[in-house]
């Protein structure tokens, strides 16, 4: 049998309620099993992103609370350090509190990964989604 460690985490009530609804909907036997699956998915995504190499093109979508302490300024400051890979940006106001920033990128996968990691670590950022592809000339016929 696999050795298990017991941990304790703090979550916002609304987030836990939504997670519990998904647990019930998917028929999990326990909250712990659902959390293990979520952690496995997170690890797989992390490994995939960190295995990318070579020239890539894609987008980084960032949802953030624009009321959070200077998050917009920090996002802009970070972007200025990656002008070698940023092709364009699009800013969308989602509601009174939240914005979506989509950053189109093209360049070395390592630089794209660095930019994604820096944006993910910012306080006030709610979600970051990276979508990458190989440039057209590298797609097999």
Curated annotation (Swiss-Prot):
GO terms for biological process: regulation of DNA-templated transcription; response to nickel cation. Binds 1 nickel ion per subunit. InterPro entries: Acetolactate_synth/TF_NikR_C (IPR027271), ACT-like_dom_sf (IPR045865), Arc_rbn_hlx_hlx (IPR013321), CopG (IPR002145), CopG/NikR_regulator (IPR050192), Ni_resp_reg_NikR (IPR022988), Ribbon_hlx_hlx (IPR010985), TF_NikR_Ni-bd_C (IPR014864). Its cofactor is Ni(2+). This is Putative nickel-responsive regulator. The lineage of its organism: Archaea, Methanobacteriati, Methanobacteriota, Methanomada group, Methanococci. Coiled coil: none annotated. Keywords: DNA-binding, Metal-binding, Nickel, Transcription, Transcription regulation. CDD domains: RHH_NikR_HicB-like. Ni(2+) binds at residues 80, 91, 93, 99. HAMAP family: NikR (MF_00476).
